[in-house]
């Protein structure tokens, strides 16, 4: 085979080409470090593959913040996340990076963020109305169109990374640790992000993907919300994940996608893929979710969950879909007064998904007290974990 057919993003293709090198050359970025003594850890909120997350207090102004202490990874990965967060600072519904600090002894870096009052998505999604889902999907699209316009792919859009303060109807897209700058023609790592939200391009090892990867992931989120099926595509491994997708979207379009881009499919698929016809979205509608499903919702979903990344709606096109007409009309009427264009800090009690409300204990010492940053808490006490914390 002559190799895969190249692909370029349909929108914001040359954003980084037209920007100065220092905008996207994160490996050369010089980090400006803040003072770690400004922060006191309060409790542990959760942990992920690359970090541990704590609620903390900024003792200079007594405001709650979230401290993400990074586990040992390549320095360039840390610089990439910092550079992207700095480039996107102030963008609509983008989590605000407030400070960057480092323990002077262990040299472990930590990112300090605004605090968001989040409700565990597994609880929240069960209570959302049809309008709520439209509203929050539109808010996510604001963040995605903005980051795409800035030449950045998030690459890890999923419920765990969407913080929703439902009381104030505020949303933040968090965890930019896997985000990357888009350069046309560049080949990217396909071993990124959570299995249930992986786009077909990742599952068939097509490396010249672009912003449209985020739109597939958004489609998976929408499907899980309107059908109340979480996750929507539930594969046992990466191979089974594509099989689950093919059983619904059909194998004919999958092979059409593979042929179009001259993709060589892993031989392991020969025995497990089979032949499947395309199914109708309506088959997932039942008495418990029918109030969330509408013709425009299914049409919108159908335009996101496409094998061919080139044929998916862009974030801007998605915002113009009839599914959002009522939301757009309401926001226009209100002058977007309740829909902040920037990332205004949100007062909060918890930030990570899956965190139960617990009484906030007294601050337990400076950032150096983290079990990641230093061996022991200065007060000789462990930092308490929030119950049910997860990432």
UniProtKB/Swiss-Prot annotation:
InterPro entries: CK2_alpha (IPR045216), Kinase-like_dom_sf (IPR011009), Prot_kinase_dom (IPR000719), Protein_kinase_ATP_BS (IPR017441), Ser/Thr_kinase_AS (IPR008271)
Cross-referenced SMART domains: S_TKc
Keywords: ATP-binding, Kinase, Nucleotide-binding, Proto-oncogene, Serine/threonine-protein kinase, Transferase
Tissue-by-tissue expression: Detected in blood platelets and megakaryocyte cell lines. Poorly expressed in lung. Highly expressed in lung tumor tissues.
ATP-binding among keywords: yes
Domain Protein kinase: 39-324
Catalytic activity entry: L-seryl-[protein] + ATP = O-phospho-L-seryl-[protein] + ADP + H(+); L-threonyl-[protein] + ATP = O-phospho-L-threonyl-[protein] + ADP + H(+)
Record-linked PROSITE patterns: PROTEIN_KINASE_ATP, PROTEIN_KINASE_DOM, PROTEIN_KINASE_ST
EC number: 2.7.11.1
Enzyme superclass (EC): transferase
MF term (GO), any: protein serine kinase activity
One annotated GO biological process: regulation of cell cycle
Active site (UniProt): 156
One Pfam family per UniProt: Pkinase
CC per GO annotation: cytosol; nucleoplasm; nucleus; protein kinase CK2 complex
Positions annotated to bind ATP: 45-53, 68
Subunit structure: Heterotetramer composed of two catalytic subunits (alpha chain and/or alpha' chain) and two regulatory subunits (beta chains). Interacts with PML.
Function: Probable catalytic subunit of a constitutively active serine/threonine-protein kinase complex that phosphorylates a large number of substrates containing acidic residues C-terminal to the phosphorylated serine or threonine. Amplification-dependent oncogene; promotes cell proliferation and tumorigenesis by down-regulating expression of the tumor suppressor protein, PML. May play a role in the pathogenesis of the lung cancer development and progression.
Family affiliation: Belongs to the protein kinase superfamily. Ser/Thr protein kinase family. CK2 subfamily.
Record protein name field: Casein kinase II subunit alpha 3
Organism in which the protein naturally occurs: Homo sapiens (Human)
């Amino acid at each position: 085979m002559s190799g895969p057919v190249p692909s370029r993003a349909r929108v914001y293709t040359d954003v980084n080409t037209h920007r100065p090198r220092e905008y996207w050359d994160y490996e050369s970025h010089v980090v400006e470090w803040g003072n770690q003594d400004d922060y006191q850890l309060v409790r542990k909120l959760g942990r992920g593959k690359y970090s541990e997350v704590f609620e903390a207090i900024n003792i200079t102004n007594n405001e709650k913040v979230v401290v993400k202490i990074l586990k040992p990874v390549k320095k360039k990965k840390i610089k990439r996340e910092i550079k992207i967060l700095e480039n996107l600072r102030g963008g609509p519904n983008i989590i605000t990076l407030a400070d960057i600090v480092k323990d002077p002894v262990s040299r472990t870096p930590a990112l300090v963020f605004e605090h968001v009052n989040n409700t565990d998505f597994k609880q929240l999604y069960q209570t959302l109305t049809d309008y709520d889902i439209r509203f929050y999907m539109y808010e996510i699209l604001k963040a995605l169109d903005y980051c795409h316009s800035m030449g950045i792919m998030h690459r890890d859009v999923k419920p765990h990374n969407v913080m929703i303060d439902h009381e104030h109807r505020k949303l933040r897209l968090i965890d930019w640790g896997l985000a990357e700058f888009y350069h046309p023609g560049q080949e990217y790592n396909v071993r990124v992000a959570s299995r249930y939200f992986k786009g077909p391009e990742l599952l068939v090892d097509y490396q010249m993907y672009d912003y449209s990867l985020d739109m597939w992931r958004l489609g998976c989120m929408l499907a899980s919300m309107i059908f109340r099926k979480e996750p929507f595509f539930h594969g046992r491994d990466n191979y089974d994940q594509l099989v689950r997708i093919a059983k619904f979207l059909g194998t004919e379009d999958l092979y059409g996608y593979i042929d179009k881009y001259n993709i060589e499919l892993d031989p392991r698929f020969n025995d497990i893929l089979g032949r499947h016809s395309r199914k109708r979205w309506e088959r997932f509608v039942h008495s418990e979710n029918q109030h969330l499903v509408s013709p425009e919702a299914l049409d919108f979903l159908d335009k996101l969950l496409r094998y061919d990344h080139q044929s998916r709606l862009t974030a801007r096109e998605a915002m113009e879909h009839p599914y959002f007409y009522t939301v757009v009309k309401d926001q226009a009427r209100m002058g977007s007064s309740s829909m902040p264009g920037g990332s205004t800090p949100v007062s909060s009690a918890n930030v990570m998904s899956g965190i139960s409300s617990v009484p906030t204990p007294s601050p337990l010492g400076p950032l150096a007290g983290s079990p990641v940053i230093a061996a022991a808490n200065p007060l000789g006490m462990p930092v308490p974990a929030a119950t049910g914390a997860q990432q």
